[in-house]
Amino acid sequence: MLALICGQGALPTRIVKNCYMRPLIVSLTQFQPDELVPDINFRLETLGTLLDLLNQREVTTVCFAGGIRRPDINSTLIDEFTQPLAASISEAMAKGDDGALRVMIEIFEQAGFDVIGADDIVPDLLPSVGVLTKRLPTLQDQTDATRGHAIIAGVSNLDVGQACAIANGQVLAMEAYGGTDWMLNSLTERVGSWPLGGVLFKAPKIAQDRRFDLPCIGPETCQKVKEAGLSGIVIAHAGVLVLDVADVIAEADRLDLFIWVCEVPL
């Protein structure tokens, strides 16, 4: 049986719709998924109890999907089943996002569960290489994409973010704790401070475990890119999830944006 460990956003719903049998829906109490009613809510302080419940439900496979911000840990709420995991949880919370997620995956694997990625369930979340839209990237857009890849690769070991905005070779913004939406919103507030144009570049971190926390885009990403004054979106092939690809392409075409799925390194 599959358990879907859900965060916020549309990805968990997309996965459930693609499953021939409904998975067990599990959610962190602080981060509820869109349009889904969890079968189990839990806190990190009760993670050990969750692992026991999953075994009781005969769960064998786990998939993590959706957005999660790092929650605060209240040591007084750690229950007896979670006490043996307390040191590992504390270690995870002290790391960057990628490091924290690696520790969490290890906890589930050591408990006997197979951990799979969202694209193992929904392969078409990863579109093929090429330009998906009517609009094509210019030579400058391609140069900016190359610059974007170099930047994301360069900061990967710092475990910072998975996206940046580049225009005419200049870094307009970098993704950090607030995520891509926050980054794009910060550009929207400053539109007019530079010539319009540029790209949103998204890619996973170098050596990232791709079963967890792959970057993603959806129709709303296109809207925010347009509002930020950028010309299009460049994503790394097999490294960025595209929710409802037909809707994303239609929205990009409507807004006269390009979407380019490229092999990296460029």
What do the PLM-derived regions correspond to, one by one?
Residues 1, 20-23, 36, 57-60, ...:
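Short coil/turn connectors at secondary-structure junctions
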Residues 1-28, 45:
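N-terminal basic/disordered segments at the start of proteins
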Residues 4-6, 25-27, 62-65, 93, ...:
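General beta-strand structural signal in soluble alpha/beta enzymes
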Residues 5, 11-12, 98, 118-223:
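Conserved mixed alpha/beta catalytic, RNA-binding, or beta-rich assembly cores of soluble enzyme
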Residues 13-18, 63, 224, 247-248:
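A short acidic, amphipathic alpha-helical/loop segment
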Residues 28-57, 76-92, 96, 182-266:
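Feature captures the catalytic cores and cofactor-binding loops of soluble hydro-lyases/lyases
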Residues 78-139:
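Hydrophobic alpha-helical segments and helix pairs
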